[in-house]
């Protein structure tokens, strides 16, 4: 469902999916329901859906709303999973954290993992850690984008064309992240391999430390 008819029709045409004009209409036949609304809209949506959620596996990507809140407000939902994906999912390089509710079966958990693994990597965490996940991987892309922009700006300041500087910065971040993931080597060790004694890299790292990069 979508409140804008044109968007519903566009999704139907693009993916060949069933659409509905109301949330209740959509949930009647759905085995899996994804709650993807603003936190301030959730109460109204759950009130509308009510007992129709009882038969379905409910996946919530609503930031800051607990499983308990959803169960209490939904009036029947017992199989609830909280998920925190991030925007790199748009290019299938996302990171999603999942917190499983008490009523979620192993089959349910496997299905949810499969869904989110189509757009990146998945990790299961205790629900009490979801706020930390939100700050790290949920908001993390924004921090990385700013770092890429800063690296590129430095390159431009040194005379590189903007497009070249952005490519150098983005690919450096991408490759470095992949090296961490695939090598299994601690980032500190990888950093030390780049920093020669008395070289430019260690000088740059010193400046980052002096200016509160870790803070």
What residues fall within each predicted segment?
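NAD(P)-dependent Rossmann-like dehydrogenase/reductase catalytic/cofactor-binding core
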Residues: 170-215
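Short pre-catalytic strand/loop immediately N-terminal to key active-site residues, enriched for Gly-Thr
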Residues: 81, 130-135, 187-192
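Rossmann-like NAD(P)(H) cofactor-binding subdomain of soluble oxidoreductases
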Residues: 15, 22-98, 102
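NAD(P)-binding Rossmann-fold cofactor-contacting core
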Residues: 1-12
């Amino acid at each position: 469902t979508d409140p804008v008819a044109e968007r519903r029709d566009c999704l139907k045409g693009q993916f060949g999916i069933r659409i509905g004009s109301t949330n209740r209409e959509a949930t009647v036949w759905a085995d899996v329901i994804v709650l993807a609304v603003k936190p301030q809209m959730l109460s109204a949506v759950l009130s509308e859906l009510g007992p129709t959620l009882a038969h379905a596996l409910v996946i919530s990507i609503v930031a800051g709303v607990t499983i308990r809140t959803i169960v209490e407000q939904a009036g029947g939902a017992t199989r609830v999973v909280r998920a925190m994906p991030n925007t790199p999912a748009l290019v299938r390089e996302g990171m999603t954290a999942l917190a499983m509710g008490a009523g979620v079966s192993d089959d349910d958990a496997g299905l949810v993992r499969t869904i989110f693994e189509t757009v990146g990597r998945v990790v299961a965490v205790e629900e009490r850690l979801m706020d930390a996940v939100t700050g790290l991987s949920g908001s993390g892309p924004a921090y990385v984008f700013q770092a890429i922009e800063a690296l590129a700006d430095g390159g431009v300041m040194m005379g590189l064309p903007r497009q070249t500087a952005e490519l150098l910065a983005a690919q450096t971040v991408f490759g470095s992240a992949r090296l961490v993931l695939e090598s299994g080597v601690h980032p500190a060790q990888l950093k030390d391999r780049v920093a020669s004694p008395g070289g430019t890299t260690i000088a740059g790292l010193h400046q980052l430390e002096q200016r509160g990069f870790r803070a």
